[in-house]
């Protein structure tokens, strides 16, 4: 089947609506929408929930940008895109909870297509989801990864292990020599065997995110915590900022190509702290995190 960008866009708009409704149902607070237009072509809907009952900040962004030619920074690595018009669309979200026992989560699904008259379109899907706990609970990690594994199952036995490894490799802070969290799924450049198969997988990932995340939120949101846990949460959020500004390809691409800065940086936590040469107390729950986030088979 020929790639159908309109069909993908409708799914993404509906996905943004559904996820916002699900997060509001858990939190009680409403999202505020900020619709925007891109001068060079396209636009989006940025939605943010702030200071809710459960979530300190949750951002769910839809964007659809298009243009007559790709920026040079994009075609340098993919010369086949030169001289083609393009469309790029996706839903990206990050949730930063109040309670340090509730992990931060991130998800993204996206579609890209580049066309020129007389030639086959170049297209692919990408996306995934990952979890960043501050305090490790094995049952949460197992649930997260089993949900990821189960949604991958209909698409092949090798899909989950391949995209889990890609996620582990991608969300890695080289300058800290540590993982950002416990991973999940990450895929990109997906265009085989055909459009329908790839689109179905992207839909499964988009829908699977809340199946993986919300049961963990419900399990942890009422746990008592104090200043020690809050300070550790803010300290560990620093790693999130470091990754996004130093290593994340999507953030860098967006900023380098004139993307909408407010939407790109919507993933940043509202509060964060750094502490020089911080060392958690031996044997403490805080010290246990470094071992918990090491790559392992959670399935």
Curated annotation (Swiss-Prot):
Catalytic activity from the UniProt record: coproporphyrinogen III + O2 + 2 H(+) = protoporphyrinogen IX + 2 CO2 + 2 H2O
GO function terms (MF aspect): coproporphyrinogen oxidase activity; metal ion binding; protein homodimerization activity
Superkingdom, taxonomy of origin: Bacteria
Names of required cofactors: a divalent metal cation
Entry-linked Pfam families: Coprogen_oxidas
EC number: 1.3.3.3
Site residues (Important for dimerization), renumbered to this chain: 175
PANTHER family xref list: COPROPORPHYRINOGEN III OXIDASE, MITOCHONDRIAL, OXYGEN-DEPENDENT COPROPORPHYRINOGEN-III OXIDASE, MITOCHONDRIAL
Protein's name in the database: Oxygen-dependent coproporphyrinogen-III oxidase
Gene: hemF
């Amino acid at each position: 089947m020929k790639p159908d960008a309109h069909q993908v866009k409708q799914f993404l708009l509906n996905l943004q609506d559904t996820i916002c409704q699900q997060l509001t149902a858990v939190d009680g607070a409403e999202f505020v929408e900020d619709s925007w237009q891109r001068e060079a072509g396209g636009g989006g809907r940025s939605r943010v929930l702030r200071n809710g009952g459960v979530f300190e900040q949750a951002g769910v962004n839809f964007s659809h940008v298009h243009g007559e030619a790709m920026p040079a920074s994009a075609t340098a690595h993919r010369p086949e895109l030169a001289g083609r018009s393009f469309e790029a669309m996706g839903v990206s979200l990050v949730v930063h909870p109040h309670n340090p026992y509730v992990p931060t989560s991130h998800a993204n699904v996206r579609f890209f297509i580049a066309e020129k008259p007389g030639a086959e379109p170049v297209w692919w899907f990408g996306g995934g989801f990952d979890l960043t706990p501050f305090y490790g609970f094995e049952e949460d990690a197992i649930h997260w990864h089993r949900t990821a594994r189960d949604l991958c199952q209909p698409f092949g036995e090798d899909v989950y292990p391949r995209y889990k490894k890609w996620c582990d490799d991608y969300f890695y802070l080289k300058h800290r020599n540590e993982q950002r969290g416990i991973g999940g799924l990450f895929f990109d450049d997906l265009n085989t065997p055909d459009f329908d198969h790839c689109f179905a997988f992207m839909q499964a990932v988009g829908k699977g995110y809340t199946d993986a995340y919300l049961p963990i939120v419900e399990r942890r949101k009422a746990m008592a915590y104090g200043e020690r846990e809050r300070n550790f949460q803010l300290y560990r959020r620093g790693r999130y900022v470091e990754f996004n500004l130093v290593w994340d390809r999507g953030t860098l691409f967006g900023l380098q190509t004139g993307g909408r800065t407010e939407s790109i940086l919507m993933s940043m936590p509202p509060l964060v702290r750094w502490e020089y040469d911080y060392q958690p107390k031996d044997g403490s729950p805080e010290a246990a995190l470094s071992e918990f986030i090491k790559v392992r088979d959670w399935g």
